[in-house]
């Protein structure tokens, strides 16, 4: 968990952890005097958090990896350290296994900008009373994204590269249906064959 103000840096609140209790304690420990800078470096926070997520994925190449950037703000970019276009390009050009979510609070937000940054999902709360529901909505979407990665292993008889394989995956969930199809050469594949 990182927090940001108008300074040209993200401040670490708590390192990456799977402990809900540890993360909750870190958030509960936030006080009103956490920052003395009243400005908002929103675009810088987007650029820097995207880089952190990219680096995390690059450091774990031996596993199926995904990351989520969840940005919570009650304002627009006031620091003018970075351009809006640079922040939106960071999101657009990011690794496709990074999901972007935004949560906006209050009347001083720019919903259009936040929807551009939160390309996976964006939610807005008019006041602090609506925040819990808003956070729960994003939490559910983050969990859905995290649970959408699968490892598929198949021992192809064409491991010598002598032909092309055609893979079709279909999914039906109630009335929802989806499919993806791809062709690949299995030269050197060993998954599922051992």
Predicted regions, residues:
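Envelope-exposed proteins and targeting segments
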Residues: 65-68, 96, 101, 148-150, ...
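Surface-exposed acidic, glycine-flexible loop patches that form ligand/cofactor-binding
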Residues: 51-63, 158-161
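Soluble periplasmic/extracytoplasmic beta-strand elements of cell-envelope proteins
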Residues: 1-3, 26, 68-72, 101-102, ...
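Solvent-exposed, acidic/flexible segments
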Residues: 13-16, 20, 35-46, 62-65, ...
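C-terminal "exit" segments of structured domains
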Residues: 121, 125-194
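Von Willebrand factor
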Residues: 1-18, 45-46, 68-73
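VWA/integrin I-like adhesion module and closely mimicked acidic/polar interface patches used
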Residues: 44, 68, 72-126, 130-141
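Second-shell loop/turn segments in exported
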Residues: 8-14, 28-39, 73-78, 101-102, ...
